[in-house]
C-alpha cells in the first residue's frame, strides 16, 4: 500500500522531499501547504533548482493546485497548521518542514486537520527522535509527532553505531564541515545571537555550534554524554562531511575498522551507510540517497584506540530520502502500509 503524504513548508527540504518522493514507490505526495508561496511560484521553484538541476518531469498549475506528471497535488496556503484540510486528500502522514512547528504541541496541530502522524524534518526539543538504521525499530504506534533528527545526526549516528557496537566508544568529538544553508547571509548582516553567523556565507569559513553529536545520545542511549561537536560552515552549496574522532575501548587497526564499516554498509545498514575507497570530493556526492558515506582513504589513526573517521553526506537529498523512509516505516508499523 502506498502512503499518502502531505508536506507543510515548501522550502528547501520540503521541495527536496517532494522530488525524492517521485523516485519513492511507496510514497504519494497528495497535498502541499505553504502560506508564503502561491502555486505558480511553487511550480517554478520545484522545476528549477540551482543545486539539484531541473525537475525531470512535467509540472503545471491547475487553478490553485499543482499537476505533477499528470497527477493533481492539492495546494493550500494556510498559516495555521490546524486549518490545513489534510483529510480531504487522505494525507494522514505529514512532513512538517517549515522549521517553525518543531515542538510536539505545535506539530500536533496538524492532527486537527485530519493528519494522524507528523514527522518533523528537523531536531525537536521534545518529540521522540528517530534515525533510520539506528533506532527506528523503537517506534511505537501511539507516537503522534516524531523527529527525523538533523542531517548531521543522520550521518553521524549510523557510523557511531557501527564503531560502538564493535569496539565500544569511550568518548569522542565531532566536527561537521557543513555547506551553507538558508539561515546564513549572502552579504554581512545583523545576527545578534550569532555574530559570526551573520558574516557572508560565500566568502568565509564560519565556526558554529551544532547539537548533532549530543543528539546521537538520544538515538543511541549508551553514547549519551560521550559525544559532542561543532560545525564549520564553508562556502559550498551542498554536501557536507563529518569528522569523528573517538577513543575506543577495544583496540583495532584502521584496516580492521574500515572492514567493520564496509561489512555494515553491505549488510544491516545497506542503503543508509555507504563505503568508498575512491578519491572523491564533495560534489561527487551531490544527489546521493544515503545518510552517510564513509571515506576509507580520508581517515587516520594514532594508535589502536584513537582514530579519526570521515564520512560524507548530501545534507539535502540524503536527509530528505530518510524522511520518506521513516514515514513508510511508521505507516507499516501503524498498519497503514
Curated annotation (Swiss-Prot):
Its EC number is 1.2.1.12. It is found in: Cytoplasm. Disulfide bonds: none annotated. Keywords: Cytoplasm, Glycolysis, NAD, Oxidoreductase. The keyword Cytoplasm applies. One of its GO terms (molecular function) is NADP binding. The record marks 178 as: Activates thiol group during catalysis. The active site is at 151 (nucleophile). InterPro entries: GlycerAld/Erythrose_P_DH, GlycerAld_3-P_DH_AS, GlycerAld_3-P_DH_cat, GlycerAld_3-P_DH_NAD(P)-bd, Glyceraldehyde-3-P_DH_1, NAD(P)-bd_dom_sf. Homotetramer. Belongs to the glyceraldehyde-3-phosphate dehydrogenase family. This is Glyceraldehyde-3-phosphate dehydrogenase.
Amino acid at each position: 500500500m502506498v502512503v499518502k503524504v502531505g508536506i507543510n513548508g515548501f522550502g528547501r527540504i520540503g521541495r527536496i522531499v517532494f522530488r525524492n518522493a517521485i523516485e519513492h514507490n511507496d510514497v504519494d505526495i497528495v497535498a502541499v501547504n505553504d502560506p508564503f508561496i502561491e502555486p505558480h511560484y511553487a511550480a517554478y521553484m520545484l522545476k528549477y533548482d540551482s543545486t539539484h538541476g531541473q525537475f525531470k518531469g512535467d509540472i503545471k498549475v491547475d487553478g490553485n493546485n499543482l499537476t505533477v506528471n499528470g497527477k493533481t497535488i492539492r495546494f493550500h496556503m494556510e498559516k495555521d497548521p490546524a486549518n490545513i484540510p489534510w483529510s480531504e486528500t487522505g494525507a494522514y502522514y505529514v512532513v512538517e518542514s517549515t522549521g517553525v512547528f518543531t515542538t510536539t504541541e505545535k506539530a500536533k496541530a496538524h492532527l486537527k486537520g485530519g493528519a494522524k502522524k507528523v514527522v518533523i524534518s528537523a531536531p525537536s526539543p521534545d518529540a521522540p527522535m528517530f534515525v533510520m538504521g539506528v533506532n527506528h525499530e523503537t517506534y511505537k504506534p501511539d507516537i503522534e509527532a516524531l523527529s527525523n533528527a538533523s542531517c548531521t545526526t543522520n550521518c553521524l549516528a549510523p557510523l557511531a553505531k557501527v564503531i560502538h557496537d564493535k569496539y565500544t566508544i569511550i568518548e569522542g568529538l565531532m566536527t561537521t564541515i557543513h555547506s551553507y544553508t538558508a539561515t546564513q547571509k549572502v552579504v554581512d548582516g545583523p545576527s545578534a545571537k550569532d555574530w559570526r553567523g551573520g558574516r557572508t556565507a560565500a566568502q568565509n569559513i564560519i565556526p558554529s555550534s551544532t547539537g548533532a553529536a549530543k543528539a546521537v545520545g538520544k538515538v543511541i542511549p549508551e553514547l549519551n554524554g560521550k559525544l559532542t561537536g561543532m560545525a564549520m560552515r564553508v562556502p559550498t552549496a551542498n554536501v557536507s562531511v563529518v569528522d569523528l574522532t573517538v577513543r575506543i575501548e577495544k583496540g583495532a587497526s584502521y584496516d580492521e575498522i574500515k572492514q567493520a564499516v564496509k561489512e555494515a554498509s553491505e549488510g544491516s545498514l545497506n542503503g543508509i551507510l555507504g563505503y568508498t575507497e575512491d578519491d572523491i570530493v564533495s560534489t561527487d556526492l551531490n544527489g546521493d540517497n544515503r545518510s552517510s558515506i564513509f571515506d576509507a582513504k580520508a581517515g587516520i589513526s594514532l594508535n589502536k584506540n584513537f582514530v579519526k573517521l570521515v564520512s560524507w553526506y548530501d545534507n539535502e537529498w540524503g536527509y530528505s530520502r530518510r524522511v520518506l523512509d521513516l514515514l513508510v516505516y511508521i505507516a507499516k508499523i501503524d498498519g497503514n502500509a
